Amino acid sequence: TTIFNAATKGSVDVAGYSSKLNVGVAKVPDERLTVLANMYKPRRVVPAEVTYTDLPPPPEGFGQTRGISGEYLNAIQSVDALLIVVRAFANSSVSHVDETIDPIRDAENMLMEMTFSDIGLLDRRLARIQEGLKKVKVQDRGDVQREQDLLLRIKEALNSGVALRDQQLASDEIRRISGFGFLSIKPLIAIMNIGEEQLEESEALEKQL
C-alpha cells in the first residue's frame, strides 16, 4: 500500500491490514509528449496512464497449495503485470498473517499459489477438451489436438516448477493461451520491504530474494 500511495499520490491508510481493494491511476510523464504538444498545439494533451490495483494481504490459509480463487483470483487476472511486496522488517505493532517474518517464504508461497491456480485452470480446460474430442470427427481433431498437446506440455513444466513466463513458448502459442487467465505468465517484480536498520544488508537481502 505504501508503494501504491507513492505511485498514485494516494493517501490510503497503511497502518493496519484491510480487506479492501484499492485502485488508483498515475499519469506517465513523457518529455516527448511536451515537445509534440508545443509543435502541434492540440486542444488537449492526454498523457499515458497506468492503473494500479492494491490488493489486500493474502487470505488466511494462503500458501497451503489450495490455489488462488474467488475475488482474489479475479483481481490478479485482471492486471497486466504483478508487483509482489514481501515484508522483511520486524515490528511488533504490525501483525503478520503467518505470525512470523520470512520474506522468502512469503514470496515462494505467492508464486506457488499462482502455479497451483494455473494448474487448476489447465486441468479444467483439458477435461473439456477431452470431452469435446469424443464428439469431433477424426479429420477435424487437428487444432483441438494441438491445443491439448500444448496445454499438457505447459502443465508438465509447471509441475516441474517452471512458471509460464519462463517457459519457451512460440508467439502463436502465447496468443493461443492469452485468454485463459493464467497468473504465472504475467511479468513480475518482487520487492522486499525492509526496516531502516537493515539498509546496510539490503544487497544481501536482495540476492536472497
Which role fits each region the language model picked out?
Residues T1-F4, R128-L209:
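C-terminal-of-GTPase-core extension/linker across diverse P-loop GTPases
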Residues T1-S95, P103-I104, R124, I129-G132, ...:
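Conserved G1/Walker A P-loop phosphate-binding module
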Residues V12, E31-N38, T53, S92-S95, ...:
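Flexible, active-site-adjacent loop/turn segments at secondary-structure boundaries
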Residues S19-L21, P103, A107, A157, ...:
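Preference for short coil/turn "hinge" residues that link or interrupt alpha-helices
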Residues T51-T53, D80-R87, P103-A127, L150-D166, ...:
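Conserved beta-strand/loop subsegment of P-loop NTPase cores
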Residues P58-G63, E99, R105-M114, K137-G142, ...:
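Flexible beta-alpha connector loops of hexameric P-loop NTPases
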